[in-house]
Amino acid sequence: MRSGGRGRPRLPVGERSLLERPSPPKRRLIPRAQLLPQLLLALTVALVFYTIWSSWHSQTEELPLGRELRGPLIGSLPEARVRRVVGQLDPHRLWNTFLRPLLVVRTPGSPGNLQVRKFLEATLRTLSAGWHIELDSFTASTPLGPLDFGNVVATLDPGAARHLTLACHYDSKLFPSGSAPFVGATDSAVPCSLLLELAQALDQELGKAKERAAPVTLQLLFLDGEEALKEWGPKDSLYGSQHLAQLMESTPHGLGSTRIQAIELFMLLDLLGAPNPTFYSHFPRTARWFHRLRSIEKRLHRLNLLQSHPWEVMYFQTGEPPISVEDDHIPFLRRD
């Protein structure tokens, strides 16, 4: 992993409105065309969630927590519904409204970090679905001394028995003093903007699901402190996910369970934004969900709903993953 640099003093955020776009440093932006493959990922996540809550609402009211859900519950959406979902996603809104405000230096404890955190909270609070927003604030020992961190946790219906949890990190990598400003577009502003676009595009549908008390709900995690501050290692990385996973493990949820046990499926989005991304299945337990995403990609291709997509399957690849990945999923995986 990359090595970092010296920390920056924490300064008060100015008088700028939380929803006003910050003035980022000069940089080369990602071409919009390169974001279209990432919008596919938002599409697939949206479609999987539609499938889950539509099927589970009618079939799993009495299913005990902890019991895995099997293939018969994974249905297929009608073509008209697929096209409607695709039509609700807006790449221009993704770019201008959600991504641009995130393209600032946002290392832990910096003014940009706090500003982005408040932007995430404020944006989620504007949605009509009525998300329950929590801030997991904590101070951790780091190679640079004690630093303040904050995870943003958005849960559509906190009372639902199960959570489909989508996660990303919003902090950017710290580089030595004098380096060019690093805003971490792919690492990981784009994933954060994808989750915001997903929540906005499905705002009405998610609100309806919440009203009828569907047994599975959507949860979004915006994690702080993923990046190492000096050198990647177990004591210098994943600050936010380690703290939140520990907190969820010790927090009751329903009868005889904890918040981490309520997570039925955990999907981490990171390092997205470059052209032609590829994804591999890393865990046998979630292989069926990976193949579901692969099937959705094929279906979107056959329906001619994808741009710059000459082959039936480009992104969700079969075979062994080329490398193992240490990322924010690890603290949750260890407690599963």
Q: Predicted regions span which residues?
A:
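Secretory-pathway/membrane protein signature
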Residues: 1-336
